[in-house]
C-alpha cells in the first residue's frame, strides 16, 4: 500500500481535525505502512506522532508544510527529513519561521536547510517554474502528481489529509470559522475538499500514473529519522579555573558544612552518601546550575522559598542554599528525592516571589544565551464547554441560546459531551430541532482538538547549546518556547527547571522591606524563633486570614480544635487537610490531646509514628516502615511506595511478596507482616511528601509570625494583593478593624498605589478609588516626592497638571476623604472644585504667579455631609466602607439581640440590613415580587422576595429603615443570594426579643452584683428567663439563676452590659 506523505494533524491548529491517533488507526485499517506528519510551519505533534506510529508498527516520517517564495509567487511545499541530520534541519527551519513570524520561506532559507531533506513542490504551475529550477541540483526534489511537468524532476503521488472521511469535511469549515471569527455556511451542502484519508478502494479508482505511487514508497524508504529519548543533554557548569564539576561541588559542600554549627560526623556521613549518588548519576552539574541561579536571586534582592517538593530532603540542596530546610533535623529522606535504584532526572522546583521571578529568568538568559533558554508550550483544547460555545457562535446562535448551552453543561473538570448528553435537559436541547442536532454533530467531531498555544506557567528549559539542535522553538508572549510540551522536552533529555512565582513570598519580602525602612528592624526570617507562643495562640484561634496554606474555613476549624503547640502540628495540618487523609483528622486531634489513646500495631512503629500520634501522614513514614520491617533500602522502599500509589495489581502482588519475605527474614511473624503491609497500603494513596509539607509550613509560620508581631504591615500588604476584589478587600478591612487596627482613608500626602502601613494604622490605597487610574496616581506620587507634601487642596490643584486634574478625579479623592487631613469638610471641598477648574486660577505650575493672583481665602465653608451619605460615597468609590456604616454602627450596639452579618449567617437566622435597592417586577401570573440588594454595612448581597412574602411586607419596603431579615440561602447563576421569608423593622425585632427571650447568656460577671436582688435561684413563673454565664477560658456554660422579664429593672440589666458581652436567645 502506498505511503501517505502529507498528513496534517490537529496540531496544525484550526486547520485540521485529524487527531494523530485517528490518522494512525486509519493507516492500520487501510494497510498503509508509512505516514508523514506535515503540519504547516510547526512540529508540535512530532513526539506524539512518533510514539503512536511506533506502537502500531507504522513507519513515522517527519516533515512540515511550508510556503516557498521568490518574492513574486508562493508555492506550497512539503519537506521531509531523510535522517536525523534532516530532522535537526527541520527543527531549525521551523524555529526560524516561528521565531521570526514568517508567512513565507525564501528559497535561499530553504536551500540552507535542504541537504538532508526531501522537497516536494505542490500544485506547480508555469509561474512557479523559476522557484523549482533553483532546486535542480538538489537530488531529492519532486513535484506532486497535480503539478505541471518540469524537465528532470520526478512526480510523486501525495494526498493532502486534514480530516478522517469525506463526511467530516464540515469540520474544516467549522475550524476556519472559529479561527477567522466568521459564521458557518449551513445553507449549502458542505463541499468535500478531497482532503480525507482515502480507502484502498478510493485509491484504486484514482486516475494517477502508477509510477507516482511507487515514487511515494521510494521516498518513504529514504526517510529514516528517529526521535532519540533520554539523551544526556545536561548543560555543563562553568567552574572557577576549569576545575571538574565533581571536585568543585565537593569542595563547596565541605566548606559550607564546616561553617554550620552541626554534628559534623553525622552530617558528613549523610553528605558522602548523597554526593556519591549524585555524582554516580552524573548530576553534579545540575546541582551547581540550580545553586548558581538561586545564589543570584538571593544576592539580588529576590526572595526564594525555603524549598518545594521532595528536594528539601537533600542535605546537598541544603548546603548549596537551594533549600533552607535541614533534612536531618526534620527527618527527611534523600531517596524520596533522588532514588539510586530508579534513575530519573532530579526535579528541583523553585519558588520565587512572583513580582521578581522574571529577573531570575533574565539572568539565566544572559548567562546561557537567548537561544539556550526557553519556556515551554502548552495547548488549550476545545473541551466540552468551549467547543459547545464556539460552534454555537459560528452557527449564529443568539446569546440567550449560548447561555442556555453553558448552563446545561455542568462545571465539572474534564466533562465530555457524551457525559453531558446523559443529562435529560441537555439531550432535549440537542434534539430540539435539526439545527441543534447538526451543532452537536460538529461539536463531537471537534471536541478535544488543540485550539491554541500558551506558555507553561513555570517551566524553563536550559542548555549550553542552541535549543533548536534538540527541539523546535516558537515565539511566546514573553520569549522563546519549545514547540514540545514539558513532558516531551524532558523525555528528550532537556533540563527543565520550574521557576514558580509565589505571591506569599512577595508579601513577606515587602513586609520585611517596609519594617526595615520604617522601624529600623532587620528581620532575618532564618533566625526567628519557631517556638513563639504568640504564633501558636494566633493559630489556635483560627486567626489565619491571609496566611499561606492555612486560611480556608476548613483549616481554621481544624486549627481551633487542634490548638497547635509546635511547628510539627502545622506540618501535620497542611498534610492532613486534603481529600483522603481528612478522615484521619479527628483521630489525630483526639490522640494529640490525649496521647494515651495512641495504639501501635507493633512496638517498632512507635519511633516512626510517634510525632504523628500513630497516624501515617507522610510518604517518608511509609518508606521508613518498609525499611524497618522488611529491611528495604530507602530506594527499594520508594519503589514500593510508588507501586502502592499506582494500584497496579500485578506489581502490588509482587511487592507484597517481596515485603513479606523481607519481614520474615528480618524476624517478624507473617501475620504481623501482612497487617503492616495492609496498613501502609491504606495510607500510600494519599500520604503526603513530608519534605514539601515542612517547606510550605515554614512559609506559613513566617507569615503567622509577621502577622502577630507586625500586624499593620501584614494587613497592608495582604490588602495590596487583593486590590480589585471588593469582597476580599471588605472582608480583610473588617478583620483588620477587629484586630484593633485603624483603617485610615486615602491620604493625598501619605497614600500610594498600594496600601501603606504606619504606626497609626493603614492608609488606604489611592489605587482602590474608582475613577483614579494608575497613571494619575503615578503623577500625584511623583509630584509629592519631587516637591514635597501638598499644603492644602489648592496647592494640590496648582501642582497637578491639567491632563490629570479632572472633575471626576477631584470628586473621587474628596468623597473618599483623601483631603480630610487639611481640616476642611468634604462638602466644602466639593464646593471648591469649580474654583480650581476655572481658567484664571489654572496658572500652570507657576507658584509665584499663583500666589499673586489667587485670593488667600477661597473656601466657602459648608457643614459636613451626613454620615449615611459619606458611607454611601465611600462604598460607591471604594467598594467598601471606611467610616463606620450606619448599619454596622447599629449592629455593634444591637448585637446582644443575637443577630448576624451576611457573611456568617445561616438559613433562617436574623440578619441586620438596609435595602440599598428594591426592584419590583410582575410575574407571568400577574403577581408582584421584588429583587433587592441587602447591605449589612460590610458587604452587599442580592435577595429575592417572592409574591406571597412581597404581599405581606410590601408596605415595609417603602420605608427607609433598618430591617431584620431571615430566609434561605441558595445560588443563582453561581452567585449566593437570600430568598427572604421574613422582614421586621429593627425596633419591632428588638421589642419582641426583649419580651420573649428564653435565655440570657453573659460572658462578663462584673455587673451581676448590682442586680443581685433580681436574680432568683429557681424558676417561679412563665416570665422567668434563665441567666447563664459562659466562661471562655474553659469553654463551659453555667446557670446563674433566673430573671423576670416583667421586672421594671429588666431593660436596665440588659443595657448595663457591653453589647458584645451579652446575648438574648
From Swiss-Prot:
DNA polymerase III contains a core (composed of alpha, epsilon and theta chains) that associates with a tau subunit. This core dimerizes to form the PolIII' complex. PolIII' associates with the gamma complex (composed of gamma, delta, delta', psi and chi chains) and with the beta chain to form the complete DNA polymerase III complex. It comes from Staphylococcus aureus (strain MRSA252). This is DNA polymerase III subunit alpha. Its EC number is 2.7.7.7. Belongs to the DNA polymerase type-C family. DnaE subfamily. It catalyses: DNA(n) + a 2'-deoxyribonucleoside 5'-triphosphate = DNA(n+1) + diphosphate. NCBIfam families: polc. Keywords: Cytoplasm, DNA replication, DNA-directed DNA polymerase, Nucleotidyltransferase, Transferase. One of its GO terms (cellular component) is cytoplasm. PANTHER family: DNA POLYMERASE III SUBUNIT ALPHA (PTHR32294:SF0). One of its GO terms (molecular function) is DNA-directed DNA polymerase activity. DNA polymerase III is a complex, multichain enzyme responsible for most of the replicative synthesis in bacteria. This DNA polymerase also exhibits 3' to 5' exonuclease activity. The alpha chain is the DNA polymerase. Pfam families: DNA_pol3_alpha, DNA_pol3_finger, HHH_6, PHP, tRNA_anti-codon. It is found in: Cytoplasm. GO terms for biological process: DNA replication.
Amino acid at each position: 500500500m502506498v505511503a501517505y506523505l502529507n498528513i496534517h494533524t490537529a496540531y496544525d491548529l484550526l486547520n485540521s481535525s485529524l487527531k494523530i491517533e485517528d490518522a494512525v488507526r486509519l493507516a492500520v485499517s487501510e494497510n498503509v505502512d508509512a505516514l508523514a506528519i506535515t503540519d504547516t510551519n510547526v512540529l508540535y505533534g512530532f513526539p506524539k506522532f512518533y510514539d503512536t506510529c511506533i506502537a502500531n508498527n507504522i513507519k513515522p516520517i517527519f516533515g512540515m508544510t511550508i510556503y516557498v517564495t521568490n518574492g513574486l509567487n508562493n508555492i506550497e511545499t512539503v519537506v521531509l527529513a531523510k535522517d536525523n541530520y534532516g530532522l535537526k534541519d527541520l527543527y531549525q527551519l521551523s524555529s526560524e519561521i516561528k521565531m521570526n513570524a514568517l508567512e513565507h520561506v525564501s528559497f535561499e532559507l530553504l536551500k540552507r536547510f535542504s541537504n538532508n531533506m526531501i522537497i516536494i513542490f505542490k500544485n506547480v504551475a508555469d509561474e512557479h517554474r523559476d522557484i523549482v529550477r533553483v532546486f535542480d541540483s538538489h537530488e531529492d526534489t519532486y513535484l506532486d502528481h497535480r503539478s505541471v511537468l518540469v524537465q528532470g524532476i520526478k512526480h510523486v503521488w501525495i494526498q493532502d489529509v486534514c480530516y478522517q472521511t469525506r463526511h467530516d469535511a464540515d469540520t474544516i469549515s467549522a475550524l476556519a470559522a472559529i479561527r477567522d471569527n466568521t459564521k458557518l455556511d449551513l445553507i449549502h451542502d458542505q463541499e468535500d475538499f478531497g482532503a480525507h484519508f482515502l480507502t484502498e478502494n478510493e485509491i484504486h479508482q484514482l486516475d494517477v500514473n502508477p509510477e507516482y505511487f511507487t515514487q511515494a514508497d521510494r521516498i518513504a524508504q529514504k526517510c529514516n529519522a528517529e526521535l532519540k529519548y533520554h539523551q544526556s543533554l545536561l548543560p555543563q557548569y562553568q567552574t572557577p579555573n576549569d576545575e571538574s564539576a565533581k571536585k568543585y561541588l565537593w569542595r563547596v559542600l565541605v566548606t559550607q558544612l564546616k561553617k554550620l554549627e552541626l554534628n559534623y560526623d553525622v552530617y558528613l556521613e549523610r553528605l558522602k552518601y548523597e554526593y556519591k549518588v549524585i555524582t554516580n548519576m552524573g548530576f553534579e552539574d545540575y546541582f551547581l546550575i540550580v545553586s548558581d541561579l538561586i545564589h543570584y536571586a538571593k544576592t539580588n534582592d529576590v526572595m526564594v522559598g525555603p524549598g518545594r517538593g521532595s528536594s528539601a530532603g537533600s542535605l546537598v540542596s541544603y548546603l548549596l542554599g537551594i533549600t533552607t530546610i535541614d533534612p536531618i533535623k526534620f527527618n527527611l529522606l534523600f531517596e524520596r528525592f533522588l532514588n539510586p535504584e530508579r534513575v530519573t532526572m532530579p526535579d528541583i522546583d523553585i519558588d520565587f516571589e512572583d513580582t521578581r521571578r522574571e529577573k531570575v529568568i533574565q539572568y539565566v538568559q544572559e548567562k546561557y544565551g537567548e537561544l539556550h533558554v526557553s519556556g515551554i508550550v502548552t495547548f488549550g483544547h476545545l473541551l466540552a464547554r468551549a467547543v459547545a460555545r464556539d460552534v454555537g457562535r459560528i452557527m449564529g446562535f443568539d446569546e440567550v441560546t449560548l447561555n442556555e448551552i453553558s448552563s446545561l453543561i455542568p462545571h465539572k473538570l474534564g466533562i465530555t459531551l457524551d457525559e453531558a448528553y446523559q443529562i435529560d435537559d441537555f439531550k432535549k436541547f440537542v434534539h430540539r430541532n435539526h439545527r441543534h442536532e447538526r451543532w452537536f454533530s460538529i461539536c463531537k467531531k471537534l471536541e478535544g482538538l488543540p485550539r491554541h498555544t500558551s506558555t507553561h506557567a513555570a517551566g524553563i528549559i536550559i542548555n549550553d547549546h542552541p535549543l533548536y539542535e534538540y527541539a523546535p522553538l516558537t515565539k511566546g508572549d514573553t520569549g522563546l518556547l519549545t514547540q514540545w510540551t514539558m513532558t516531551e522536552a524532558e523525555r528528550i533529555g532537556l533540563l527543565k527547571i520550574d521557576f514558580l512565582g509565589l505571591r506569599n513570598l512577595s508579601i513577606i519580602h515587602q513586609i520585611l522591606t517596609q519594617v526595615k525602612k520604617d522601624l529600623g528592624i532587620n528581620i532575618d526570617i532564618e533566625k526567628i524563633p519557631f517556638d513563639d507562643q504568640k504564633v501558636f495562640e494566633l493559630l489556635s484561634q483560627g486567626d489565619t486570614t491571609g496566611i499561606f496554606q492555612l486560611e480556608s474555613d476548613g483549616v481554621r476549624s481544624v486549627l481551633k480544635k487542634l490548638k497547635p503547640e509546635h511547628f510539627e502540628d502545622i506540618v501535620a495540618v497542611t498534610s492532613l487537610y486534603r481529600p483522603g487523609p481528612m478522615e484521619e483528622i479527628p483521630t489525630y486531634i483526639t490522640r494529640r490531646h490525649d496521647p494515651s489513646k495512641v495504639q501501635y500495631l507493633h512496638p517498632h512503629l512507635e519511633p516512626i509514628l510517634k510525632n504523628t500520634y500513630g497516624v501515617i501522614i507522610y510518604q517518608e513514614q511509609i518508606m521508613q516502615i518498609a525499611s524497618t520491617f522488611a529491611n528495604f533500602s530507602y530506594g527499594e522502599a520508594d519503589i514500593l511506595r510508588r507501586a502502592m500509589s499506582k494500584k497496579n495489581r500485578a506489581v502490588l502482588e509482587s511487592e507484597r511478596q517481596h515485603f513479606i519475605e523481607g519481614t520474615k527474614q528480618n524476624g517478624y511473624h507473617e501475620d504481623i507482616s501482612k497487617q503492616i503491609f495492609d496498613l501502609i497500603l491504606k495510607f500510600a494513596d494519599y500520604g503526603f511528601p513530608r519534605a514539601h509539607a515542612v517547606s510550605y509550613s515554614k512559609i506559613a509560620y513566617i507569615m503567622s509570625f509577621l502577622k502577630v508581631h507586625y500586624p499593620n504591615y501584614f494587613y497592608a500588604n495582604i490588602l495590596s494583593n487583593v486590590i480589585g476584589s471588593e469582597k476580599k478587600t471588605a472582608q480583610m478591612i473588617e478583620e483588620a478593624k477587629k484586630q484593633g487596627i485603624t483603617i485610615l482613608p486615602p491620604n493625598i500626602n501619605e497614600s500610594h498605589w498600594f496600601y501603606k502601613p504606619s504606626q497609626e494604622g493603614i492608609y488606604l490605597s489611592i489605587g482602590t478609588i474608582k475613577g483614579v487610574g494608575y497613571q494619575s496616581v503615578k503623577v500625584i506620587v511623583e509630584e509629592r516626592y519631587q516637591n514635597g507634601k501638598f499644603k492644602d487642596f489648592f496647592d494640590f490643584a496648582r501642582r497637578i497638571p491639567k491632563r490629570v486634574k479632572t472633575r471626576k478625579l477631584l470628586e473621587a479623592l474628596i468623597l473618599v476623604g483623601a483631603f480630610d487631613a487639611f481640616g476642611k469638610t468634604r462638602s466644602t471641598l466639593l464646593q471648591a472644585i469649580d474654583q480650581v477648574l476655572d481658567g484664571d486660577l489654572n496658572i500652570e505650575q507657576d507658584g509665584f504667579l499663583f500666589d499673586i493672583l489667587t485670593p488667600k481665602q477661597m473656601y466657602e465653608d459648608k457643614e459636613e455631609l451626613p454620615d449615611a451619605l459619606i458611607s454611601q460615597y465611600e462604598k460607591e468609590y471604594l467598594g467598601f466602607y471606611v467610616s463606620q456604616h450606619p448599619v454596622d454602627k447599629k449592629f455593634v450596639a444591637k448585637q446582644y439581640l443575637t443577630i448576624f452579618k451576611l457573611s456568617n449567617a445561616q438559613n433562617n437566622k436574623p440578619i441586620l440590613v438596609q435595602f440599598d435597592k428594591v426592584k419590583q417586577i410582575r410575574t407571568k401570573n400577574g403577581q408582584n415580587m421584588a429583587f433587592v440588594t441587602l447591605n449589612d454595612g460590610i458587604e452587599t448581597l442580592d435577595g429575592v422576595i417572592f409574591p406571597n412574602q412581597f404581599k405581606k411586607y410590601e408596605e415595609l419596603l417603602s420605608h427607609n429603615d433598618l430591617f431584620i431579615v431571615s430566609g434561605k440561602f441558595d445560588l443563582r447563576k453561581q452567585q449566593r443570594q437570600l430568598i427572604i421569608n421574613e422582614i421586621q423593622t429593627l425596633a419591632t425585632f428588638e421589642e419582641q426579643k426583649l419580651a420573649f427571650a428564653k435565655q440570657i447568656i453573659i460572658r462578663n460577671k462584673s455587673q451581676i452584683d448590682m442586680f443581685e436582688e433580681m436574680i432568683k435561684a429557681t424558676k417561679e413563673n412563665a416570665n422567668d428567663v434563665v441567666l447563664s454565664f459562659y466562661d471562655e477560658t474553659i469553654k463551659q456554660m453555667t446557670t446563674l439563676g433566673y430573671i423576670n422579664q416583667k421586672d421594671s429593672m429588666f431593660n436596665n440589666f440588659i443595657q448595663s452590659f457591653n453589647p458584645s458581652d451579652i446575648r438574648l436567645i
